[in-house]
Amino acid sequence: MGVVTKKILILGSTGSIGTQALDVIADNSDKFEVVGIAAGGSQPDLVISQAQQLGLAADKVAVADAQAAAVVSKALGGEIISGTDAAKILVETTKADTVLNALVGSLGLAATLATLESGAHLALANKESLVAGGEFVTSKAKLGQIIPVDSEHSAMAQCLRSGTRDEVARIVLTASGGPFRGWTREKMWEVTPEQAAAHPTWAMGQMNTLNSATLINKGLELIEATLLFETDADLIDVTVHPQSIIHSMITFTDGATIAQASPPSMKLPIALALDWPHRVPKAQPALDFTAAHTWTFEPVDDAAFPAVQLARHVAKQKGTYPAVYNAANEEAAEAFLRGRIKFPQIVDVVDEVLQGASQFAGVASHVDDILATESEARARANALINRLATNL
């Protein structure tokens, strides 16, 4: 019997995760076949190139931005899917074994829900959709349907195979510390968007790089871990590991700790998610243990980087509180990039919006509840940003 290729749908094909996924698939064409791509539209020429190289029909290409979609449609000689729901529609109209959701931000929520509804495996790089959707999203998933792409959660999933659920004592989530590790809060008032865009060990998109600089990204990952692995936030430790070699660890009840180690590259977790639970040979180079290595670990400076402790509180609140955390951050991060607020004020905005969240956040029984909570959080965040901006 011949090898059966998996049909893969890639959402966010022009981003860092999407382009690396296409590289993995190109190197393993006997295992995978791309049946559709979706993108926001900031790089229409790249979408055109990808579609042509993959031999995709126009109706298997989705672009959210209308102007970019028109450019892509003309180049491909047919009408592509366009609009804010383009990725969701592509999922609903394309038969796939696995959907890689690498869209940026909570805009990926609709596509995540559509994937779960379709029955396809969800290779989830868009952590924001899980954080925003919370238990509403996980309640829609079949056992094992969501496969994490984040290197940390991929590492957790791999380490968890070393024991049973009741043998897990603690989860250890590692963080690089970002470009401002060791800085005081006072020093960070002078941080520029250009400085925040320079990550010491990972190559990521603009928003993920900024979220890593504030450690909001680690907060999102803590919340994500509670949802993916159905564990309490207090059982998750966060440690700063600047070398980004150990991606996460699991400590078991007998005192053993299992760690997943590999060079900082997303190709391994991407490949593993696409073919889970099987490993893809030579997904990336392995560590050379005959060479000298120094790995260090240190606690998070919560005074300088309060985002992690804030996320721990949010994870305990459950319901739509994580959606508030994410939505307020998206607005504050964008305001910082536009020069409207200072770097430390990003998390300050998130914190203040959360303090009033009891007035509008709660349990979500429908996706509209999540969207309404997000909308209110964004409105409150922007009102606060407007006040802060006038004082700069």
UniProtKB/Swiss-Prot annotation:
It holds the Pfam family DXP_reductoisom. InterPro entries: DXP_reductoisomerase, DXP_reductoisomerase_C, DXP_reductoisomerase_N, DXPR_C, DXPR_C_sf, NAD(P)-bd_dom_sf. The keyword Nucleus does not apply. Its cofactor is Mg(2+); Mn(2+). It comes from the Bacteria. It is an enzyme of class 1 (oxidoreductase). Mn(2+) binds at residues 150, 152, 221. It catalyses: 2-C-methyl-D-erythritol 4-phosphate + NADP(+) = 1-deoxy-D-xylulose 5-phosphate + NADPH + H(+). The keyword tRNA processing does not apply. GO terms for molecular function: 1-deoxy-D-xylulose-5-phosphate reductoisomerase activity; manganese ion binding; NADPH binding. GO terms for biological process: isopentenyl diphosphate biosynthetic process, methylerythritol 4-phosphate pathway involved in terpenoid biosynthetic process. 1-deoxy-D-xylulose 5-phosphate binds at residues 127, 151-152, 176, 199, 212, 217-218, 221. NADPH binds at residues 14-17, 40, 43, 126, 128, 205. Pathway: Isoprenoid biosynthesis; isopentenyl diphosphate biosynthesis via DXP pathway; isopentenyl diphosphate from 1-deoxy-D-xylulose 5-phosphate: step 1/6. Its EC number is 1.1.1.267. SUPFAM superfamilies: 1-deoxy-D-xylulose-5-phosphate reductoisomerase, C-terminal domain, Glyceraldehyde-3-phosphate dehydrogenase-like, C-terminal domain, NAD(P)-binding Rossmann-fold domains. Keywords: Isoprene biosynthesis, Manganese, Metal-binding, NADP, Oxidoreductase. Belongs to the DXR family. Catalyzes the NADPH-dependent rearrangement and reduction of 1-deoxy-D-xylulose-5-phosphate (DXP) to 2-C-methyl-D-erythritol 4-phosphate (MEP). This is 1-deoxy-D-xylulose 5-phosphate reductoisomerase.
